[in-house]
Amino acid sequence: MQLEVRNLSVAIHRRPIVSGVSLTVDNGEFVGMLGPNGCGKSTTLRAIYRLNRKYSGLIMWDGKDEHTITQKEFARRVAVASQFNDIAFDFTVREVVLMGRAPHMGMLTRETDSDQEIVAQSLDMVDMAHFSDRSFASLSGGEKQRVILARALAQKPEFLILDEPTNHLDIKHQLQTLAIARDLGISCLAALHDLAMASRFVDRVYLMKAGSVVASGPVGEVVTSERIHEVYDVEARVTPAGPAGDDWDGGLTVAYRYPQRVR
């Protein structure tokens, strides 16, 4: 599933948050959005996945204006795993993941054996099968994050949107989450913080600062010492993670140094 965003702008309480953002995600491509806190990554994603419909610009899915796509079709084809995981009622983990099947079920129909199998597979993918009968509210932040990802996987989407998907996760599950997104073979757009981690998995990145895209392209061309200093206001040294051809090939190592000693 293809996504094209043209000249997207969003203002909140008349204050511009996102200004003129344009981006594309092709079929099967894993694209990352990078940038410091408050740069507009999440605001851009919320417009794309319809949480905020008050925007100017154009959002197109497979060449169709998003306003021509029904909510039911959108929910069947696009899944979202966001960083805000509060659920008002006390559901079990299995019940939360089963919500991902809702777009594929009728109003008055119950889940099928196939739905239950998809839920079990999704929980297994994120190492949460052994928690399936636990209360969602009782989980840690990282465990909740993995359940929300499982819910998105259970939708069997054509396009996956991830908003800070590795927040609260230990290193193993950060790697697992991004590997899942890469290996699904579907289109994925993810807002990420860890530059080195992103470099191991995504095909291209958009680097944002103050609500605008300042650079885009392959990670190795965008994530440079100069750009990190420009966007994040820290000194950085960027090097390949390993010699070409070995198991580390394709990633970057990013070392940081704050320019002044904090007193």
Question: Which role does the model predict for each range below?
Answer:
Residues 225, 231-263:
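ABC ATPase nucleotide-binding domains
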Residues 3-5, 18:
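Conserved structural motif at the start of ABC-family nucleotide-binding domains
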Residues 49:
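Helix-to-loop junction immediately C-terminal to a conserved catalytic motif
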Residues 98, 113-131:
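Conserved ABC ATPase "signature" region
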Residues 57-65, 74:
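Conserved ABC transporter NBD signature motif
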Residues 34-36:
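The feature captures the beta-strand-to-loop junction immediately N-terminal to the Walker
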Residues 160-164:
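Catalytic Walker B motif of ABC-type/P-loop ATPase nucleotide-binding domains
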